[in-house]
Swiss-Prot record:
Gene encoding the protein: murD
Source organism (scientific name): Anaplasma marginale (strain St. Maries)
NCBIfam families named in the record: murD (TIGR01087)
Keyword Aminoacyl-tRNA synthetase: no
Gene3D superfamilies named among the record's database cross-references: Mur ligase, C-terminal domain, Mur-like, catalytic domain
Keyword Transport (UniProt): no
Cellular location(s): Cytoplasm
Record-given protein name: UDP-N-acetylmuramoylalanine--D-glutamate ligase
GO cellular component: cytoplasm
EC number(s) given by UniProt: 6.3.2.9
Pathway linked to the protein: Cell wall biogenesis; peptidoglycan biosynthesis
Length: 438
């Protein structure tokens, strides 16, 4: 029962519902008793299930056939409807609803769409799996843009999205799903709820999933489409129009899919090209997503802590050379070999941390990429910076772990903050020296 669970409980209590809640973690339970006034904390084994109308699951509680939580089994045995905060939100908000899913880029796309719509005069709010519990979002907005995970999509029933977006589908969460086909099917549930679908035809899994969809706007970052949105070589192409996307605050290469999808959604809602392009240029991006945090001499530091899969790391590497790459953590299925087959020549050296360090070392050795065991982010930053600055060439120290953070950190934000703190400690003397010289 994290932030989403707390916001769900508080919202339902305020609406007048009788709410029962539970968390297996005793420390969390103790804290939440103080935060959630009006809620009864009762173990599910003591529920009178015939009196319960719905079981609302927090994100991450396993509920798929191959990996089912004990409480889900109890609810199913009692014939109780199992739902999520997102479904409750969607059926209670009379506003435009835009849902965004995919393996990589969801949060940035959600925030970019919201950024564009607000600048177009469409009062909008973002939420969902991005870290803002949807039931705590302010009411009365003209549009809500929601990040939807595969878990949330599986629990949704009878939802009506004005626009649904699929950015990409690459291997992820295969510790939860029995195979890739099940993961794709979970993502594909957004098709059932979308009046208009915006989909990446350049991604093979997404293209196959959407091949029989009627009302759809396609986008591609690999070829120019006769119909749909294309982002190529720093330009957006749509219905015979061409717009330059230079001078962005975010990296255009790694954010090409996010830009294309956001453009398509905004156009579908009637936003002008002028407003869209001006908004994209001013969008500041999100923390922990290919975020430039400092530049010292010839070295740029980039915090990409959110990159927990090989496919997301590839987006950071595609626009950079001479990379001193900090990688590792709690490994996911797929490893890093797909990255190395394409981008090994961009990596000057890898600095390995966390549980996956030994496994990654084997892959790097096969690809003939130099690497060193650092075990934690602080040491990795220190060593990588020393080697990068000694190289005398323009270089990037990149935290892009290709792993989850749960071996050493509470979440990817905490890991990214640790990287930024280590960088700040290094950068401070150089800034002082630079100021003194001037």
């Amino acid at each position: 029962m994290g932030e989403t669970g707390i916001s769900t409980v508080c919202s339902l209590v305020q609406s007048g519902a009788r709410v029962l809640a539970w968390d297996d973690d005793k420390c969390v339970l103790r804290k939440n008793r103080e935060l959630c006034a009006g809620c009864e904390f009762v173990h599910p084994y003591e529920y009178r299930w015939d009196e319960i109308s719905e079981l609302v699951l927090s994100p991450g509680v396993p509920h798929s056939r191959c990996n089912e939580s004990w409480v889900v089994k109890l609810a199913k045995r009692a014939g109780c409807h199992i739902t999520s905060d997102v479904e409750i939100f969607c059926r209670s908000r009379p506003a435009r609803l835009i849902g965004v899913t995919g393996t990589n880029g969801k949060s940035t796309t959600v925030e970019l769409i919201g950024w564009i719509l607000n600048r177009a005069g469409i009062d909008s709010e973002t939420g969902g799996n991005i870290g803002k519990g949807v039931l705590s979002l302010p009411q009365g907005k003209a549009a809500y843009i929601l990040e939807l995970s595969s878990y949330q999509l599986e629990l949704m029933r009878g939802v009506n999205l004005d626009v649904g977006v699929i950015l990409n589908i690459t291997p992820n969460h295969l510790d939860v799903y029995s195979n890739m086909a099940d993961y794709i099917a979970a993502k594909g549930r957004i098709l059932e709820f979308s009046n208009l679908l915006v989909a990446n035809c350049g991604d093979s899994n997404t293209a196959h999933l959407c091949e029989n969809v009627g009302n759809m706007v396609e986008f591609s970052c690999g070829k120019k489409l006769a119909r749909g949105v294309s982002v190529l070589d720093g330009r957006i192409y749509f219905q015979g129009r061409v717009a330059e996307i230079g001078g962005l605050k975010i990296d255009s290469a790694s954010n090409a899919e996010n830009i294309a999808a956001s453009y398509a959604v905004a156009k579908s809602l009637g936003v002008s090209d002028e407003v869209i392009m001006a908004s994209i240029r001013e969008f500041p991006g999100l923390r922990h997503r290919n975020q430039v945090v400092a530049e010292v001499a010839n070295v740029t530091f980039v915090n990409d802590s959110k990159a927990t899969t090989a496919a997301s790391v590839a987006k950071a590497l595609v626009s950079r050379e001479n990379v001193y790459w900090i990688a590792g953590g709690k490994s996911k299925d797929g490893g890093i070999e797909p990255i190395l087959s394409l981008y090994a020549n961009r990596i000057r050296k890898a600095f390995l941390v966390g549980e996956a360090a030994d496994m990654f070392a084997v892959s790097l050795q096969r690809a003939r990429v130099e690497h060193v065991m650092c075990y934690d982010v602080y040491n990795a930053v220190q060593i990588a910076f020393a080697e990068a600055i000694a190289s005398g060439t323009k270089a990037t120290v990149l935290l892009s772990p290709a792993c989850s953070s749960l071996d050493q950190w509470k979440n990817f934000e905490e890991r990214g903050d640790a990287f930024c703190a280590a960088v700040a400690e290094l950068v401070a003397p150089h800034k002082l020296c630079s100021t003194t010289t001037q």
